[in-house]
Amino acid sequence: MSVIIPAHNEESYLGACLSALLCSAPVLFRDGQPVPVQVVVAANGCTDRTCAVARGFGSRMTRRGWKLVILDIAQGSKIGALNAADARASGDVRIYLDADVNVGPDLLRQTWEALQGPLPRYASGRMDIIEPACFASRAYREIYRRVPFQTRTIPGAGYFAVNAAGRARWEIFPDVIADDLFVRLQFDKNERIQLSDSFRWELTEGFRALVRVRRRQDTGTRDLLARFPRLVANEDKPRFEPGELRRLALRFPVGMAVYCAVALMSRLPARSEAWARGRS
């Protein structure tokens, strides 16, 4: 099993990510022997201590019986990092993990067990959205965690995994913004598996940042489906049921106001395309 972690200037987050991985329950074959685990940190375009943080986990990985591979890639590109890490990955089960995400203790074991077998499969855990610090992001979270895409599908943002037959669905990662959506839509809804354990996922902080991230997300989705129209057949993003939106607005009026304002502002022309951490 290979865990692939693209990381761009993630010194503040990577330590917690790797620590959470190392706290995972044992992943075992049916005979009780440990499954070989390889962790590939693909540092790309880093000007901070990301690589040093990763190297600091070498002895702990060794004690666990895991293999740590650190790639120091000059160019800052998540897609380039994913492809470079894939080229070094040795596991049939591939987990793609963002460096600012913390896995639950049973998520690796559940992932391994769910992805056994010859048929193409995709799996992800439940998304536990960390409560933000700022008012706007907290209000936005109240609605975002309850939208149908979160409650009735398997989003996979931040953590997704495929088995060998599933990974054969595509060759290299194309140069797209929505890499997680690109992979999810390689599978129809009957090929995706929702795991019971969760991963902690961070929402971006601040109204302007929410707008930037939402705009980037929407642009990435449009571009992806325009370039790969065959993937539209596997899109199962549900809409609100009748009355559901109204009930949410009555229960969380401030949250709904912020959520709608972000959606509206994200449709306006962007002044710049500055990158913002987090997703919405």
Q: Where do the model's predicted regions map?
A:
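Acidic helix N-cap motif at the loop->helix transition within catalytic regions
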Residues: 13-15, 48-57
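Glycine-rich, basic loop-to-helix element that forms the pyrophosphate-binding segment
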Residues: 71-89
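Conserved donor NDP-sugar-binding/catalytic core segment of glycosyltransferases
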Residues: 105-135
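Short, acidic, metal-binding catalytic loop of nucleotide-sugar glycosyltransferases
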Residues: 19-36
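Short aromatic/hydrophobic "clamp" motif used to bind/position activated sugar donors
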Residues: 94
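Cell-envelope/extracellular polymer assembly enzymes that use nucleotide-activated donors
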Residues: 1-2, 38, 182
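Terminal low-complexity segments of carbohydrate-biosynthetic enzymes
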Residues: 203-204, 212-280
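A conserved acidic beta->alpha catalytic loop
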Residues: 20, 40-53, 75
